[in-house]
């Protein structure tokens, strides 16, 4: 202990005479008188008592003796009720005494000024954070963000190679592949294509209806795109593949009997292959084309834009295509090509899912040519919209 005291000298002596006197006598140390001109003594000057304080000074002691178990707050309530119950004549002596004390206080302390004590504020639980600390932590977080985004993009690229797609997680990567032009280079899109918009925005800019369709991914891509290494993909709703006769002029029509499509379930859009590139072999599936469908071009109703279709039906539709591909088309042709056969309509429904329009709405040759021209123009517009 002595070595510690020697190593750390104290500016003041450790001896405290007041503490020694208290310990020796067992009594409180005597109060040290202060000079009247001292500022500390003026700050401790008490206010003169009013009439209630003069009366309650003795009355509180009497109630405390009578009710020793009562709290001081309860005693104050009782004193307040008793003071209000007193009459003016009973309060008169206490009012006079308070006036005398006030005059005496003015003589003793002519320069007295009332300084109310500040209430002790509770210590704040949360302290102010240093702005430098916030800036440093923010910079560290921003430096870590590109690494996380690049790592997550690499994982998404592996999922794309394996054919695994999630509508929620694959959207940023697919958006980067779609919006990037052919000059983006081979392979997948770079992270810059995804991070071009600020992350403070709730939604990325340049949103279009095609962006909503991109998580479902295209199932039929042109081989020339893979050969040239262009990452651009043409999004469309998943559905059955089509034969080359219908690929240049895909049509989607609406009929009073329901929505009719060529070789697929109602409500699914169609797409033509990219010009200048040979279409994928999946377009030549024999199970989805039949000569009876050639009549549909002559009987078209009001055209409507292709509606959205949920992506989770794509696998079911592909499995149905594979099952139909295993069947022999000649078995259907010998029944469906027979004129006047009662099962021809039933066979058409089993193959395409709807009744042939030729049995419902016969039309003339002039109307047929006009509707065909309008249908081709509308199909060309929709194809250009989906490609762009």
From Swiss-Prot:
Keywords for this protein: Activator, Cytoplasm, DNA-binding, Nucleus, Transcription, Transcription regulation
Comp. bias regions, Basic and acidic residues: 36-45, 146-164
Tissue: Widely expressed in adult and fetal tissues. Present both in mesenchymal and epithelial cells in some adult tissues, including colon. Tends to be down-regulated in prostate adenocarcinomas and colorectal tumors due to promoter hypermethylation.
Keyword DNA-binding: yes
UniProt xrefs under CDD domains: HMG-box_SoxF_SOX7
Principal place of residence: nucleus
Entries under Gene3D superfamilies matching the protein: High mobility group box domain
Localization (cell): Nucleus; Cytoplasm
InterPro entries: HMG_box_dom (IPR009071), HMG_box_dom_sf (IPR036910), Sox7/17/18_central (IPR033392), Sox_C (IPR021934), SRY-related_HMG-box_TF-like (IPR050140)
Region (Disordered) location: 20-46, 140-197
Classification via Pfam families: HMG_box, Sox17_18_mid
SUPFAM superfamilies in the cross-refs: HMG-box
Gene Ontology molecular function terms on file: DNA-binding transcription activator activity, RNA polymerase II-specific; DNA-binding transcription factor activity; DNA-binding transcription factor activity, RNA polymerase II-specific; RNA polymerase II cis-regulatory region sequence-specific DNA binding; sequence-specific double-stranded DNA binding; transcription cis-regulatory region binding
Leader peptide range in chain numbering: none
Biological process annotations from GO: cell differentiation; endoderm formation; negative regulation of DNA-templated transcription; positive regulation of transcription by RNA polymerase II
Start and end residues of each Sox C-terminal domain: 268-388
GO cellular component, as recorded: chromatin; cytoplasm; nucleoplasm; nucleus
DNA-binding region extent: 45-113
Subunit structure: Interacts with CTNNB1/beta-catenin; this interaction may lead to the proteasomal degradation of active CTNNB1 and thus inhibition of Wnt/beta-catenin-stimulated transcription.
Protein function: Binds to and activates the CDH5 promoter, hence plays a role in the transcriptional regulation of genes expressed in the hemogenic endothelium and blocks further differentiation into blood precursors. May be required for the survival of both hematopoietic and endothelial precursors during specification. Competes with GATA4 for binding and activation of the FGF3 promoter. Represses Wnt/beta-catenin-stimulated transcription, probably by targeting CTNNB1 to proteasomal degradation. Binds the DNA sequence 5'-AACAAT-3'.
Protein name: Transcription factor SOX-7
Species: Homo sapiens (Human)
């Amino acid at each position: 202990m002595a070595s510690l005291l020697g190593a750390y000298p104290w500016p003041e002596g450790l001896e405290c005479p007041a503490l020694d006197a208290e310990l020796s006598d067992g009594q409180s140390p005597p109060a040290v008188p202060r000079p009247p001109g001292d500022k500390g003594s003026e700050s401790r000057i008490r206010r003169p008592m009013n009439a209630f304080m003069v009366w309650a000074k003795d009355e509180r002691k009497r109630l405390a003796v009578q009710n020793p178990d009562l709290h001081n707050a309860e005693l104050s309530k009782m004193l307040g009720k008793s003071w209000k119950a007193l009459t003016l004549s009973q309060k008169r002596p206490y009012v006079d005494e308070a006036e005398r004390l006030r005059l005496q206080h003015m003589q003793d302390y002519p320069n007295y000024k009332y300084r109310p004590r500040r209430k002790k504020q509770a210590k704040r639980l949360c302290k102010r954070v240093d702005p430098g600390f916030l800036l440093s932590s923010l910079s560290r977080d921003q430096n870590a963000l590109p690494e996380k985004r690049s790592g997550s993009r690499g994982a998404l690229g592996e999922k794309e190679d394996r054919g695994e797609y999630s509508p929620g997680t694959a959207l940023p990567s697919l958006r980067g592949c779609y919006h990037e032009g052919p000059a983006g280079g081979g392979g997948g899109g770079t992270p810059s294509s995804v991070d071009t918009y600020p992350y403070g925005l709730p939604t990325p800019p340049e949103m279009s209806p095609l962006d909503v369709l991109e998580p479902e991914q295209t199932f039929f891509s042109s081989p020339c795109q893979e050969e040239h290494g262009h990452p651009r993909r043409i999004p469309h709703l998943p559905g059955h593949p089509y034969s080359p006769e219908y690929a240049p002029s895909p049509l989607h029509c609406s009929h009073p009997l329901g929505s009719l499509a060529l070789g697929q379930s109602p409500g699914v859009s169609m797409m033509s292959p990219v010009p200048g590139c040979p279409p994928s072999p999946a377009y030549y599936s024999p199970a989805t084309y039949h000569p009876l469908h050639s009549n549909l071009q002559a009987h078209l109703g009001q055209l409507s834009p292709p509606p959205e279709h949920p992506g989770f039906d794509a696998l079911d539709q592909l499995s149905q295509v594979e099952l139909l591909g295993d069947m022999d088309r000649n078995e259907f042709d010998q029944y469906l090509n027979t004129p006047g056969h009662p099962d021809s309509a039933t066979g058409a429904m089993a193959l395409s899912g709807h009744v042939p329009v030729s049995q419902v709405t016969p039309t003339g040759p002039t109307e047929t040519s006009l509707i065909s021209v309008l249908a081709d123009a509308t199909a060309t517009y929709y194809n250009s919209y989906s490609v762009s």
